[in-house]
């Protein structure tokens, strides 16, 4: 089977859950069961596919989907670590962290979708400057300098929120 390693508080790991609603297997899907279910301390756990860590107050902090984390020359960078900063900038409707390049390490790039009323060149220039300034302060280790602007980002039709960045 798979090796399971518990992480220490403050370390990033995959969020796994156990409890009465966690099923032992997927119906007629042994591959999916093998990939996402495991037994630990006599409980069945489900791998959520999300990354997170427990902070000093033992609050679980969500960092994004495991499949969407990018590996940069400075180390792994999770989507929410970056997007949570970018999305607080006035004029940003939503953002997506992507990696530029065909193989690891990739160069981090922030794609923004501006709010209506912020789609002219002057506003976009101001937004991009503010985004890069905030990232330089909050995530200096990653040296994020690449940005793109799109009129809209592709989202999941059911939620209108989950960004399709792997397409």
Task: Give short role names for the model-derived ranges.
Residues 96-101, 110, 132-167:
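Conserved C-terminal "lid"/linker of ANL adenylate-forming enzymes
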Residues 12, 43, 57, 67, ...:
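Active-site lining segments that contact anionic ligands and/or coordinate catalytic metals
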Residues 17-19, 112-114, 159:
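Flexible glycine-/small-residue-rich
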Residues 22, 36-37, 59-87, 111-122, ...:
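Adenylate-forming
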Residues 6-9, 76-79, 121, 125, ...:
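Short, solvent-exposed loop/helix junctions and linker helices
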Residues 2, 49-51, 85-116, 143-146:
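C-terminal boundary motif of the adenylate-forming
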Residues 59-63, 68-69, 79, 94, ...:
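AMP-dependent adenylate-forming
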Residues 2-73:
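Conserved ATP-binding/catalytic segment of the ANL
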């Amino acid at each position: 089977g798979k090796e399971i390693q518990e992480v220490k508080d403050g370390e990033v790991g995959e969020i796994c859950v156990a409890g009465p609603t966690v099923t032992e297997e997927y119906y007629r899907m042994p591959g999916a069961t093998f990939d996402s279910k495991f037994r630990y301390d006599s409980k069945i756990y489900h791998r959520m596919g999300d990354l997170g860590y427990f902070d000093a107050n033992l609050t679980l902090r969500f960092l994004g989907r495991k499949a969407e984390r990018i590996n940069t020359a400075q180390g792994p960078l999770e989507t929410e670590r970056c997007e949570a900063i970018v999305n607080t900038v006035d004029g940003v409707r939503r953002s997506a962290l992507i990696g530029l390049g065909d193989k690891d390490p990739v160069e981090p790039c922030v794609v923004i979708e501006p709010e209506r009323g912020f789609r002219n060149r002057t506003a976009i220039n101001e937004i991009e400057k503010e985004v890069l300034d905030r990232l330089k302060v909050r995530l200096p280790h990653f040296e994020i300098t690449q940005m793109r602007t799109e009129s809209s980002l592709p989202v999941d039709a059911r939620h209108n929120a989950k960004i399709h960045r792997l397409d």
